[in-house]
């Protein structure tokens, strides 16, 4: 796992020096793709509703995979929670994380069996951070205390899924997924000024 720059930075996975372009990442059985760089940013997938992580190098024991997934040198498979409640009541999970430099990350998950063989679930999480950490700037004999600017992170993610089991041996599962990340890109640290206005927005 390679991290390019801490909070809000790109995080990729590669196996045995093949590079992130040759390491596939599947999300609930769907192999992901990135048209801009070819490298999947795994930081956008929170672990709050992940059921399992599986890394496969070479051949997969599952024969029901796509040709593109079978051609990958290695595959990181991310499987989300898909349990079926024993009753028909609504089950709600909520949590909130807080940290330094304005970090706030709430998470909520709803799941309910609405019929004997039909289950609905919804998941949403949001992450906000200012990332204005302090640092010292040395300019000859002058030392000033500055704060990182233009480093705000503002991302949200939501999923709605339906699972239908016509019998004990078969399952039909559909999901709607949305991701939106609007973040600022900090520039280099300059003397006398630290103004930077670059932004990046990713929507999936």
Annotated model-derived regions:
Residues 1-31:
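Extracytoplasmic beta-strand/coil segments of soluble accessory domains associated
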Residues 47-93:
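A beta-strand signature from Gram-negative outer-membrane beta-barrel systems
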Residues 11, 72-74, 90-92, 104-108, ...:
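Hydrophobic, lipid-facing positions within transmembrane beta-strands of outer-membrane proteins
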Residues 133, 145-155, 163-165, 169-204:
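Flexible loop and strand-edge segments within Gram-negative outer membrane beta-barrel domains
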Residues 23, 49, 86-92, 97, ...:
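Outer-envelope beta-barrel architecture signal
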């Amino acid at each position: 796992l390679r991290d390019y720059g801490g909070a809000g930075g790109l995080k990729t996975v590669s196996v045995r020096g093949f590079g992130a372009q040759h390491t596939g990442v599947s999300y609930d059985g769907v192999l992901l793709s990135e048209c801009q760089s070819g490298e999947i940013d795994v930081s956008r997938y929170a672990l709050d509703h992940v059921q399992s992580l599986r890394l496969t190098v070479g051949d997969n024991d599952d024969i029901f995979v796509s040709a593109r997934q079978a051609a990958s040198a290695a595959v990181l498979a991310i499987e989300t929670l898909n349990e079926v409640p024993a009753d028909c009541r609504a089950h709600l999970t909520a949590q909130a994380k807080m940290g330094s430099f304005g970090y706030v990350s709430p998470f909520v998950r709803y799941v309910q069996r609405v019929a004997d063989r039909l289950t609905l679930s919804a998941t949403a999480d949001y992450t906000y951070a200012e990332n204005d950490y302090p640092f010292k700037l040395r300019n000859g004999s002058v030392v000033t205390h500055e704060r990182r600017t233009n480093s705000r992170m503002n991302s949200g993610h939501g999923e709605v899924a339906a699972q239908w089991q016509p019998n004990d041996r078969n399952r039909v599962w559909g999901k709607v997924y949305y991701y939106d990340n609007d973040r600022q890109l900090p520039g280099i640290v300059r003397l006398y000024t630290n103004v930077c206005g670059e932004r990046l927005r990713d929507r999936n």
